[in-house]
Amino acid sequence: IVFLVRKGNPKKIKDWGDLARPGIAVITPNPKTSGGARWNYLAAWAWALKQPGGNAATAEEYLGKLFKNVPVLDTGARGSLTTFAQRGIGDVMISWENEAFLASRELGKDKFEIVVPTVSILAEPPVAVVDKVAVRRGSTAYLEYLYSKEGQEIVARHYYRPRDPEVAAKYASTFPRINLVTIADFGGWAKAHATHFADGGTFDRIYAR
């Protein structure tokens, strides 16, 4: 999870703390309706916990300030990209890294740039083999290819961080090192959902303020 800002970064946004500053307009979807937005939220929460004296109370206070800076809470990532890139609303958009790269490439590198925060979360799209159809559909071969050198090269060229060490080293300039947490740090998705996104959870408390 990274930040997409306007070219030249006129608001000097460098890390999560800047997103809670007065006068900063942040674009992110609604965590109640968007899976991608939940990764954004959890990455911000993780950063807040890692600050001096950080705990659940200070993280909730920080997220409250951040969401007060969100002028439009779209239902999904595509809507947020339209709001930010086409409607020109917001100073910064919280985004999956590959989506930020693609937006910059397709909409104009002269319009946007990417800021990598000090802390983020490892957001991994799931992939699995279903036994009953594995032979018929060749899904096992696909999965093996995905993690081959050639497959990992394709992954990197499409702006996903490769897992293969050699390929990762080759693309080190594209993907700066970053302090990553995982969903396991939140006790897994079931616990994260119950704590943060279920009715009456932390997001509801934050947004009701």
Show the residue positions of the predicted features:
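Sec-exported extracytoplasmic/periplasmic mature domains
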Residues: 8-9, 21-24, 44-50, 68, ...
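A conserved helix-loop-strand patch within extracytoplasmic ligand-binding domains
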Residues: 1-49
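Ligand-binding pocket segment of bilobal, Venus flytrap-like solute-binding proteins
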Residues: 51-117
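Extracellular/periplasmic juxtamembrane helices and adjacent flexible linkers that interface
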Residues: 132-209
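Extracytoplasmic/secreted proteins, especially bacterial periplasmic and envelope-associated proteins
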Residues: 14, 35-39, 43, 58-65, ...
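Soluble non-cytosolic domains of exported or imported proteins
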Residues: 7-10, 31-38, 57, 75, ...
